[in-house]
């Protein structure tokens, strides 16, 4: 079952997964929309996406899947719609906004804070942060990410509580 994206102020509640779909890798975020916080997040190879979402579904029933409408989203919808209702969100510009959102969550420290934000490069892949941006766009409000920033080049997993 597929439904269009909700207007700002969506009343989604409970546990929701967000997916920034891609051909080779996907950003995934699991959030408790009732509490307004991120539970966990990962960047996984595309072929591991369904397995990760099914594992989350077994732990806590998903109320919805929020997914970007770009790269191969129609293909992903067919694979994921059995887990929960899929709600598409316009993903235009989310990669650039994910970079800004990264620095909002984890402000630069030391000499890096002297660099203009546009010149700062986050120390991890941003696919999970892009999934966060998609979910926040859909909800019309920011979510709280209470864990330390991801670190290290080539990082595949974004830590969460």
Task: Explain the meaning of each model-derived region.
Residues 1-161:
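Phosphate- and other anionic-substrate recognition elements at nucleic-acid/protein interfaces
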